[in-house]
Amino acid sequence: MRTGKTKTILDEFGELEAKGEIQHLLVVAPAGVYRTWKVDAEKHLSDELAKRVKLLLWDSKDGPAAREKLASIPQQGGPKILLMNIEALSTVEFAQALCARFIKAAPTMMVIDESTVIKSGKANRTKFCLAAAPHCKRRRILSGLPTPQSPLDIYTQFNFLDKRIFAEFKDLKAFQDRYAITRQIKTGNGRIIEIVSGFQRLDELQATIAKHSYRVLLKDCTDLPEKQYMVRHVELTPKQKQNYLEMKEYARTKLGNQEYVTSQNVLTHLLRLQQIVAGHTTSDGDVTVDIPENKTTEMLAILEQWVGKKAVIWATFDHDVKKIAAVLEKTYGPGCCARFWGGNRNTREADEARFKNDPKCRFMIATPASGGRGRTWDSADLVIYYTNSFNYEHRAQSEERAQAVGKKTSVLYYDLVCLDTVEEKVLGALRNKMSLSDAITGDDYKKWVV
């Protein structure tokens, strides 16, 4: 994470392409990650290669015509990069067929970013990647933490690289027998099952892995900037899409019928759209109803890579503070998070003290309106914006909570942004150091209600 993995791959692709050894680069990554490769490719590819390469981006929203057009491109000449989200390989036959065609058309380097996505050997996407691997001339896996939950997670990841690495083990069970300590327990219905209770011979396993990997630690990257920014793209669920479209049409109709539209009128409707994106709606009677969303899953995926470290999570809505806290407590156990928002005025100072002093209290969940000023939470090197406030001051001030005079570590800021929604506009305005109330004029509301 933040150590230059993407640039390393793009540089290697450029070198191998120049030698005539590789013509295609297939990058498979989680849905929230794979689109960032497009930005990085445009930034890091050499000018000469950038002029010749065709950059192909899988999009689950594409219709049949767009997909057929995409499918025809691998047969054309020249270097190409195909960016695919791993989730599509679980369920979409066309996505699998496209990757297979891409690999077959020319010598290919296949890369799996955040390679823990193939740690489960039973998953369809893992089976596809393992089947595709022998047909790729080069294979690479990238991960900030290849074993987030168990050393056993490494088995299928390295099998993708080369089955000869763990050739002595005929399957995962044999691998587990070598490196795991197991015991039998009796379940509530009387069944006897075997569970992993610990691990053994990890020095041996590490020595094997070291022969086939290159590791860079963040602390060794001495030239990192004080702040680094990344975006995780999140797709709306079907229910969110339906609600969002209905609310967008309602907003446009309502604003279109007004004789004079103010920025405040527009902001009111944008706030309702943002609530849907966050995963809930609020009726006129102030009753909040949850709707399925993918942001929480994406947040947990980021935190999974942040083992044992502290993080600050910003959420605009009080409802989301409660929801995030409940999810984290369920995932990491009671006492893992502190809160700082309008709903805990009497206890939030105590919560802050726990976050600062208790190693087990890893997460601070706060609203920018309550915790954005005057707080020092510099024990965190990760900041996640679950949602953004429309107020630039809220953003600027909240970013500084993880900073402190004399701090020697870089802070990573993640924005969870739902594609094709108001969130893209909001983040754009904040990066231009503008509050939405200043950026919006009444007569340009149509470009904001998107």
Model regions and ranges:
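Conserved Walker A/P-loop ATP-binding site and its immediately adjacent core
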Residues: 6-8, 21-43, 148-153, 316-318
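Conserved helicase motor
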Residues: 56-66, 86-91, 119-122, 315-319, ...
